[in-house]
Every structure is written in structure tokens, then in C-alpha cells.
Amino acid sequence: MQKTKDKKNIEIIAYCLMHNHYHFLLYQNSERSVSDWLKSLFSGYVQRINRKYDRSGTLFERSAKPKLVTNDNYLIELIHYIHANPLKHGFVISPEDWKYSSLSDYLNNEASKLTSKRVISDYFSDGYSYQDSFQEYLESKKYEEDFE
């Protein structure tokens, strides 16, 4: 992922890699589309898996389901939903235990080599931490619902 991440074109706001699906929240900075970025990300991976297992064709059942983020509340709830996904699917007791997501970047209030600090610094720098916001989300049990 890090190799295909081009900071000028796409910013990874949040992500979670699951056993049978993934979630990316991406910010498009240029004319290069998110679907082009995803294609470049996965094409090499699919080719390697196909070679390794002497197979051909696609690996993924469905294509990406893009959602347009139109307001701040939707943005924050979407990030929470992404980070709570391992809990929703019963893979962990606590979302912090899932190491294949950007949750630790948010809880530690820092960007990593993959994630952008855009949302962390814009929304959670005034004393109200992401941890507080995420805890409220978990207590509301909204993660148990399908996200629209």
C-alpha cells in the first residue's frame, strides 16, 4: 500500500483490512480517480497471488463501493465505523486489538507512513480526543448497524 500511495493524489484517511474485505477512506487531491488508485494497488497483488497459486482471474468478489462524504458528522462516523469493523464481525473483543487498521494512528494522535494526519489535526486537536469520540460511538453500538 505504501508504494502505491502518492501523497499528491490520494490521502488515506482511515483503513481497516479484514479477512474477507477491506475499508479505505480516501481523500482525492487531484484528477487521478480513487478507482485508478485502487486498481494500481490491487493489480500487482492479484498477479502475484495468481502466479503463486497457478490461477487466473479476479480475487475480489465485488468492486469498491464508493461513498461521497458530504459533511463532518458523516466523515467522523464513517471513520468510527471503519475502526469498529473488526469488533462488529467478532474478530476482536476490543478494536484496539486489531493491528490491520489505522485506529492506533488516531488513538496516538499521529499520522503513520500510510495515513494522513488531516482529520486527526483538523477535528481532534482541541482537547476532545478521538479516543473520547470513538468510545462514545462504541457505547452507542452504532457499529452493529450497516453503514449507509
Model features per residue range: what roles?
Residues M1-E148:
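Short catalytic/metal-binding and nucleic-acid-binding patches
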